[in-house]
């Protein structure tokens, strides 16, 4: 406990009060960045697709005891509401998830903890074990291909949802992926809509859904085994926070520039194959879709977006450029909007240089990240996947893969205009010196800087993105930004 403020360099400082017995308050000092051991264990477990709750409840530290007391009391109260308030635990779980934005309801949490462990928690807190917990059986279990819920009468009854609602995190319990690894899975969807079958669904499920080589292996694989349509979707709080920065820090520390180039090339090849797959491809995100996460969506035919979605390319904040087709796709979108390669380059440059994001689909539309004449929004997150499946069915009959575009580089005169803009900003204190380096590197991807190549292809833009990324990765300032983001949660300004 204590008071916090941000000091020089963006470091968090704290005035520690816990255990202070004197009259004079101690001075501010740099806050401890270390997380409690059980929080670290829980984060590691979550990243490994294991149950994190088990980790925060084990041990005799004051953190673990606090977690046991709080969870014990909250979950005990929830269990006591059966059957007084409802016969079905699902009703309470749904109320907490829909009404209070819980990721899992209390009865789902009790299943995750284990009912015998729950009994220990309640006894430790001096609480009576509710009747519904006396029977050591899970509240949710799979019966054949159906998910069922244990009611107050101890009988298992079908897990029920309103018509048109699909919660994939629940439905996936009854499904077996045809391909999976630690970061993503590939599922076949059948029977979710009349006449729409043999679909493929790609689900990311790494920590924060950060994209890795393993994630992109599944994206590449679905382009080969595409069925009758592809949906990119998951039910996590955030669709994807972008590419795993830890991987890039490791590459930089080893000076493995070929490794960075190979990683980016694999990413680009995966999204390029996705774009030209001979079946409809729909992205159905909710929450944050940033950086590489948005680059995957940018190569889809159409987006069905939850209204509470944030989209954008934020790479410049950590000193790099979008390296998975993000510059290329944004440049194309702005050209289709403005019909001018110079205007397209300027608008793309402003988007990426400011690391702009749209905090709603409407605001994303101003950045051309959400295309109002093509993409759709869905207000109820539970109906996102249903709408995506329906749209696949509507697109199937007359679908043909997009034609590969011919691009042009913007004229060299624009580069000088951009340089003057950045230099003025640096002199005024609006930008830091490395902001200009990053911005001009972004500009160099889209501008014919040598006056030799006016026309371009997607592959040329992909190559320029990789070169620009590696050029910046070799700078000390970019390494400092990436390290600051990973170590302190915000990039240093330099």
Predicted feature locations:
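Extended, composition-driven regions rather than compact fold-specific motifs
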Residues: 241-243
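N-terminal glycine-rich phosphate-binding loop for ADP-containing cofactors
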Residues: 1-230, 235-237, 246-279, 286-289, ...
